[in-house]
Amino acid sequence: MDKNSNGKLIALAVGGAVLMGALFFSVSFLTGYIPAPNHSAILTPLRSFMGWFLLIFCASIIIMGLGKMSSAISDKWFLSFPLSIFVIVMVMFLSLRVYWEKGRTTTVDGKYIRTTAELKEFLNKPAATSDVPPAPAGFDFDAAKKLVDVRCNKCHTLDSVADLFRTKYKKTGQVNLIVKRMQGFPGSGISDDDAKTIGIWLHEKF
């Protein structure tokens, strides 16, 4: 392949990357994407795109290197060839590790979560705000649990939406909002008193 062909391929790759970045950037806003308040609405999707671009770029380097090395392989390459592949792969993963040092998941207060242990710890912390009053003295949690099992598992089980409920609603203090939605469904059978009891149990125990 001559230099002219190489130049065309490089130009095609760069142009495709720019087009992909523009589409990614546009779609992120069309889907209603909103980053955390302390993050830039412009830089955040661009950084995500750069992560994918680096992954593809490093993979391309590996393929290019293997192609060039395969034409010069001899009996003396039995050790240097696999070592070269190992070095290229390690450079790729280290570069991605440095790029994503802050983590892929960001909380609303700007903190980063990198591991499942950190995510579990975050979910177990009590919410900063709540639209549900604290449980009164002598509150019967066992009876409340039975009420929740009867009223709140008609359309789907609570376990099937547990992660969504805990991360999107309970953590943001919107438990009562979900209870009111369930109460509004035809045939829910949830009275106002039931709604208060269910809300307290969901906030305290679920």
From Swiss-Prot:
The keyword Zinc-finger does not apply. It is found in: Cell inner membrane. It is a multi-pass membrane protein. Keywords: Cell inner membrane, Cell membrane, Electron transport, Heme, Iron, Membrane, Metal-binding, Photosynthesis, Reaction center, Transmembrane, Transmembrane helix, Transport. It comes from the Bacteria. The chain crosses the membrane at residues 10-30, 49-69, 76-96. One of its GO terms (molecular function) is electron transfer activity. One of its GO terms (cellular component) is plasma membrane. This is Cytochrome c. It comes from Chlorobaculum tepidum (strain ATCC 49652 / DSM 12025 / NBRC 103806 / TLS). The gene is pscC.
